[in-house]
Amino acid sequence: MFLIDMFNKKTILPDAATALPGREEEIPTATTHFVSGRPLQGPYPEGMKKVLFGMGCFWGAERLLWEIPGVYVTAAGYSGGLTPNPTYQETTTGLTGHTEVVLVVYDPAKVSLQRLLKTFFEEHDPTQGMRQGNDVGTTYRSAIYVYDEEQLAEANAARNAFQKALRVYNHDREITTEIAKAGPFYFAEDYHQQYLAKNPDGYCGLRGTGVSCPIGA
């Protein structure tokens, strides 16, 4: 019964009354990207755009995304919840409401949002609700958080296109990806940043559906 209760708590989003209080102070993290040496927290060059992707554990997702040409910098962090400046330990309780996300700062002149969305939908399973593979909890839910209306429209169109593609291949599950305007983004602790560059044999839980997303190039 205890294990069932713990499972249920980790898969139900908290409300304002049950969310952890957090703190005013930012959690210390790296200042530069371990791979590229670029500023992790900005300022970013003029013309760059941002998007947040939740694909389960952010270690593998971040590596996947920093390797895409046209991506200026990436960072692991937390978003979509209620608790200000959460720690990793707090997010794993399910009581912050946040999901693990990767901040992607990209040059739209070199890589389109469609290209990024195609990678997002193909490289994880966006139909699993409050989990990704063996990683269970609200902190592993699929999410896209955007910064303007144009991005929002593109994200919704990509979701619809991928849902149709899933049905063609007899996948009857519904996409559960949360798509919304971005709220606060909180940088994860230093040891999470570019984790798989520092630990090449570390855990990567990315598993796609095997279905192509029919958008972009």
Swiss-Prot record:
Gene Ontology biological process terms, A to Z: cellular response to oxidative stress; protein modification process
EC id: 1.8.4.11
Keywords assigned: Oxidoreductase
Catalytic activity: L-methionyl-[protein] + [thioredoxin]-disulfide + H2O = L-methionyl-(S)-S-oxide-[protein] + [thioredoxin]-dithiol; [thioredoxin]-disulfide + L-methionine + H2O = L-methionine (S)-S-oxide + [thioredoxin]-dithiol
InterPro entries registered for this protein in UniProt: Met_Sox_Rdtase_MsrA_dom, Met_Sox_Rdtase_MsrA_sf, MsrA_MetSO_reductase
GO molecular function: L-methionine-(S)-S-oxide reductase activity; peptide-methionine (S)-S-oxide reductase activity
Enzyme class: oxidoreductase
Active-site residues, Swiss-Prot/TrEMBL: C57
Single GO cellular component term: cytoplasm
UniProt xrefs under HAMAP family: MsrA
Family per similarity comment: Belongs to the MsrA Met sulfoxide reductase family.
Role summary: Has an important function as a repair enzyme for proteins that have been inactivated by oxidation. Catalyzes the reversible oxidation-reduction of methionine sulfoxide in proteins to methionine.
Identification of the protein by name: Peptide methionine sulfoxide reductase MsrA 1
Species the sequence originates in: Rhizobium meliloti (strain 1021) (Ensifer meliloti)
Gene that this sequence comes from: msrA1
